[in-house]
């Protein structure tokens, strides 16, 4: 038995045997199967040590395939141990049925169960091999995915910068439109002030003309008074006196018109003062709003520069 334990798997199976690549448990006794499993366990421990040395370089998919293989081996061992426990429950004097001729008497495992376990083992081994190959291909495809996932944050960062630039452009256009709306009333107020100034100049020119007419009328009135005194001394015609009265009456009417025009000028000047006061209030309000917007814009620019420096670092 000790010499048989030292044999390798190639020595136990003949070279010309048709199932050299796959071990057939139907031609082996229970002791041979146990020895084969011990050798297989030794080889598995050596492979496990090699895998532990290279575990840092292996992908999670290959480790998963190894875990499937290890579970399958434990399942096969349970299958064999359950079969042995079932056979030990039988009486020693009874000859088991379904045994192969020439089979070792210590091998208490029935032929049907041996075939079933062998088929399950081979099928599971092929399945695990296919899974390991698929996991290997999947691990080979993972670098491309990792490169794509690595390039994705850069694209997201670029899209975020573009979105921030678009938002700033929209806010700038809104501010420009608001400034245009605010400047339009200022332009209208300036145009109204120009019209009022032009009206004031016209009224001043009319007032100067009325003053000149008033001086002329005063001069004519003085001349008429001087002629009236001469006529009084010389007892002149009544016709000249009547003409002087008519001229004086005309002067009074012209003076009354001048007073009415002057009153209108005062009313217009008062209206101009009221409108000018309103313009001053609106201009002051615009200046306050503009200073507030400038302060907010400076704060937004400061926050943007701080965020940009944070992203750069």
Swiss-Prot record:
Q: Which GO terms describe its cellular component?
A: cytoplasm; nucleus
Q: Where is this region: Interaction with NXF1?
A: 241-313
**Sites of the modification Phosphoserine?**
234
User: What name is this protein filed under?
Assistant: Leucine zipper protein 4
Protein species of origin: Homo sapiens (Human)
Report where it is expressed, by tissue: Expressed specifically in testis. Also expressed in a wide variety of cancer types, but particularly high levels of expression observed in melanoma cells.
Which gene is annotated as encoding this protein in its UniProt record? LUZP4
> Where in the sequence does UniProt note compositional bias of the Basic and acidic residues kind?
34-60, 81-92, 142-168, 199-226
Keywords for the protein's UniProt record, in alphabetical order: Cytoplasm, mRNA transport, Nucleus, Phosphoprotein, RNA-binding, Transport
Q: Where is the region Arg-rich? A: 51-80
- Asked if the keyword Cytoplasm belongs to this entry, the reply reads yes
- Where is this chain's protein located in or outside the cell? Nucleus; Cytoplasm
Q: Which InterPro entries match?
A: UPF0353/GerABKA_families
């Amino acid at each position: 038995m000790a010499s048989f334990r030292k044999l390798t798997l190639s020595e136990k199976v003949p070279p010309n045997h048709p199932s050299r690549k796959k071990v057939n448990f139907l031609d082996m006794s229970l002791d041979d199967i146990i020895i084969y499993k011990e050798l297989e366990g030794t080889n598995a421990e050596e492979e496990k040590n090699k895998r532990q040395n290279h575990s840092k370089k292996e992908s999670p998919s290959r480790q998963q395939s190894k875990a499937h293989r290890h579970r399958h081996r434990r399942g096969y061992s349970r299958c064999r141990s359950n079969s042995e426990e079932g056979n030990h429950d039988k009486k020693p004097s009874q000859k088991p049925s379904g045994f192969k001729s020439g089979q070792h008497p210590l091998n208490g495992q029935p032929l049907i169960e041996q075939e079933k376990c062998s088929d399950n083992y081979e099928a599971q081994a092929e399945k695990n091999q296919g899974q390991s190959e698929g996991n290997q291909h999947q691990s080979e495809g993972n670098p491309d995915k990792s490169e794509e996932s690595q390039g994705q944050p850069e694209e997201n960062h670029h899209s975020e910068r573009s979105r921030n630039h678009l938002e700033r452009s929209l806010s700038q256009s809104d501010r420009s439109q608001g400034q245009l709306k605010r400047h339009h009333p200022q332009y209208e107020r300036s145009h109204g002030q120009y019209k009022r100034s032009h009206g004031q100049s016209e009224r001043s020119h009319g007032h100067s003309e009325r003053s000149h007419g008033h001086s002329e009328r005063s001069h004519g009135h003085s001349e008429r008074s001087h002629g009236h005194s001469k006529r009084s001394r010389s007892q002149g015609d009544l016709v000249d006196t009547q003409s002087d009265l008519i001229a004086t009456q005309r002067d009074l009417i012209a003076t009354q018109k001048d007073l009415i025009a002057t009153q209108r000028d005062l009313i217009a000047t008062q209206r101009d003062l009221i409108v000018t006061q309103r313009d001053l209030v609106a201009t002051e309000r615009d200046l306050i709003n503009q200073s507030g917007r400038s302060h907010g814009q400076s704060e937004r620019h400061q926050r943007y520069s701080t965020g940009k420096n944070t992203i750069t670092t």
